Amino acid sequence: MLHLLGIISLAVAANAQCPDYIDYSNVPHGPFSGGQYNLSYMRPDPACRTFNSSIVEQTVDRVSQGIADPDLRRLFTNAYPNTLDTAIAWHGYANNSDEELTFIITGDINAMWLRDSANQMQSYLPLLTASQAFDSLASLYRGVINLQSRYILTDRYCNSFQPPVESGISPSPNPSASEDTVRPNYTNSSVFECKYELDSLAAFLEVSTNYYNATQDASFFKNYQWVDAVKSVLQVADEMMVPTYQPNGNVSELAYSFTRLTTRSTETTANDGLGNPFNNGTGLIRSFFRPSDDSTIFQGFIPANMMFASYLKSASDIMYAIGDQDDLAGQMCDLSESLRKAISNHGIVHTSNYGNIYAYEVDGYMSQNIMDDANIPSLLSAPFIGYLDRDDEVYQNTRSLILSADNPYFMRGPVINAIGGPHQGGSHANQMTDQATHVCRVGKAKVFRISISDLFTGPMASIIRIFTTDDEAEITQQLQQIVSSTDGLGLIHESINTFNVSDWTRQWFSWANGLFGQMILDLEDRKPEILGQSFQNNTS
């Protein structure tokens, strides 16, 4: 009966006369906020929402009452429930099983990214409690963990996936992936894109840890495929610590390679799909791509190694709690500790102006890439991902650098000042909104590729900046810039032209929207007086 109720509830939402949210979210709707920016109301009708949670609705109502500014209040109301409102494409069960599965799309792309889906669920972590009910947040979490386990065991190097066969949803074509040459091979029926990103595997450990810490439900992890998926993650870690060159000078045969026929360097890798040379003895795990889905310059990608070390250690607590897995848990702890040592030995660089800082990428050959990107994990997000404390000296030095003009991707302008990145590249795009090919919906339903000369920046970095400071003036400034830069739509965009508020990408980007709401809940706990401020008649 429980299975039937779940199927019925999903069928009702699917069969309702509901507009396509890509179109709906691109046009303002009343009632408007009535503030200086007069933000649109962007929540679908309750019958059209993809998942309804009473605890989330109660939280939206309660927190909204403590937000004095009408525009900030509307932005929170729209953004926080966005994943539940629009992105739970399917929630059900594996065939002939009580194994819960949850297929979460990114928003405007009908595919499930390991990283995005883990972070979309993290938005609701403050509300997560133990429950066996199918319509609970806990059930959504279990479904994500189970489906991610399946995905990793199917294609452990891939980053985004098609709907499970049980959903009845057809796979989505990915034209850009037709130009990919990837080892090991994969099929488009199960994989949307196969860019190996270490942070995607860290995200699986993250969502697992978040669920366990909130519910203490160790028994869940004994079932199904979670332990085997963790073993597969550790196999990737081992395979990706192999250097480019063997001791005798021969090139190592890596377990993974990737090339794409493209005009953009960030969409493929050097040296016939192996990437730039990576030295022996660093102790770091290689990553071919960043969380932006852009290729790394140097494969010792420090933020992903930080995230992996952090959540590998916390996930070992689950493995110990399961019982009969102490050896595996010990391996996880040991690898986490060795990664921390490797980051300290190879990821910290001395600079004359800032002292010791963390590099963004290294190769073990004394080459470093000094920058930061808006996407998480980033250097800015190191405290957010649990790697270190906010007052860590090297972090504070790094933070000073990456929030300055010495970071080549710190974008400045009259609209918003924040960290951006190279994810948006030049030339015109086709009409498909597709993260894999960097085709983006830009203001008023126009579709373009964005040139770096347009100085696009990511609001996600502004949100993380708030998470990682107690400076009330800094928090207030960042909130003001976020509230004033939605072009009246009242949703968090993927990126914004720092000189043109009406030039932006991806209004339906559920992760960023949920992250904004999560940040407001954090402020309610840490700095509630800020939520009582007005952001009217201010300038950014």
Annotate each PLM feature.
Residues 114, 153-164, 168-173, 224, ...:
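Extended ligand-binding clefts on enzyme/binding-domain cores
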Residues 16-115, 155, 176-177:
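Low-complexity, Ser/Thr/Pro/Gly-enriched N-terminal "stalk/linker" regions
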Residues 110-265, 512-524:
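Aromatic-rich carbohydrate-recognition surfaces in CAZymes
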Residues 75, 133-151, 217-240, 315-346, ...:
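Extended, well-ordered alpha-helical scaffold segments
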Residues 47-69, 119-134, 203-219, 306-325, ...:
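Well-ordered alpha-helical scaffold segments within catalytic/enzyme domains
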Residues 84-100, 170-184, 278-290, 488-494:
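Active-site-adjacent bridging/hinge elements
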Residues 158, 167, 423-431, 436-441, ...:
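CBM-like carbohydrate-recognition segments
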